Amino acid sequence: MSKLDNYQFDTHPLFDDEFNKIINRHKCPTLKEDFERLKIALVQYLEDLNRFPVNICNRIAGLDSKVKFPAFIVKNFRCKGINKGSRSGFRITFLFSREDNLFYFVEIYNKNKKPVEDKERIN
């Protein structure tokens, strides 16, 4: 049984649209594979360290008090298809519910086209 089986992964409807646009526009055919690798890494760190490492993702500050779960942003996303290592420029925001072991991916974007995450979508 894989460690991933203990966790649920869900996405915001707009996340799926953005994900597909990045595959087509940026000609990044490995994005699906890279995203799966990110999921494995997040679960691995969570299982081994009981936290997310700050060199991969940071907690997002300044959110509404309505937000029930902590929100994180992955800043060092490795994309094989772009050949820049962790400096691909992609950002991924997600919420994590420890009680439900649920990752909810909210947004994916390129930092060169959009400098900051959409806090309205997270709220």
Feature-to-residue mapping (PLM):
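Basic, Lys/Arg-enriched alpha-helical interface segments
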Residues: M1-S86, E99-L102, N110-N123
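Short, surface-exposed coil-to-beta transition loops
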Residues: S86-I92
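Short, low-complexity Ser/Thr-rich regulatory SLiMs
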Residues: F94-R98
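Short glycine-/small-residue motifs
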Residues: F105
